[in-house]
Amino acid sequence: MRKILHPLYVLYQVLFAWWVAILLIVLTSITILIFGHWFKIKNGDHIPGVIWCKLTCWLFLIPVKVVDRDKYMPRKGENVVFAANHQGMFDIFVMYGYIARRYKWIMKDSLRKVPFLGVACAATGHIFVNRTTPQKDLLRRALDTLQDSSLGVFPEGTRSRNGKLGTFKKGAFVMANMSQKTVVPISIQGSYDILPRGCWCVHWSPVVLTFHKPIECQGRGSENVEYLMEQTRAAIAATLGEE
């Protein structure tokens, strides 16, 4: 049935969805700049982004199921590190739209070049990184951000090339260790095939966003970094069936 409907889904994207998606990027970016950056209205840099991400999921008819968010979401006012596996481009919309908590992204510097969106993200405090970003500079910016907001990171550092969970890098857990912030593992299932690398055509797939038990720091230092990283990866891997 999905193969039969796919040509109609592609036609829907070409004639309608992508045009509306582009318009949403422009309108959301302008709204964030006006209310979040210039007038500094409370949550003016956050709520428009949440609405944009949810509308994008709805626009492309992508159903998102959220599991255990209320059970494992830290109390209000507690800043944490949200760490999720990275299956595909749609992870960004799913996470920002459905985490239901204000946070800042650590994102690739290439996103800064996206018209309107890059300017809005930079103006509202999201952290851009590339391979030449000094580790000390990244840590300083992340620690400063964690004073006022939570952080969202993909510990794999890039999208999965085969749909499987990749190796985690230590950066996010070094930040959690240095700030003594709790890590909230999040597993994303179903987004790998939605927008494959090098393809503009969205492929329909339901997505499940699962929250796991928060992992608190056990002391401070390299052992704590390894502990946070191992526990986070194990929680996500168990849900993905990759133990």
State where each predicted segment sits.
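N-terminal membrane-anchoring alpha-helices
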Residues: 1-65
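Non-catalytic C-terminal accessory region of glycerolipid acyltransferases
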Residues: 4-7, 136-243
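Short glycine/serine/threonine/alanine-rich loop segments
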Residues: 62, 126, 180-181
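Short gly/ser/thr-rich secondary-structure transition/capping motifs
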Residues: 61-67, 133, 192-193
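Soluble, non-transmembrane catalytic domains of enzymes that act on hydrophobic metabolites at membranes
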Residues: 1-2, 66-69, 75, 234, ...
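Active-site phosphate/pyrophosphate- and oxyanion-stabilizing loops and adjacent acidic/basic residues
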Residues: 54, 93, 173-174
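Generic preference for hydrophobic
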Residues: 66, 82, 105-106, 126, ...
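Catalytic core of membrane glycerolipid acyltransferases/transacylases, capturing the structured
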Residues: 28-50, 58-59, 74-133
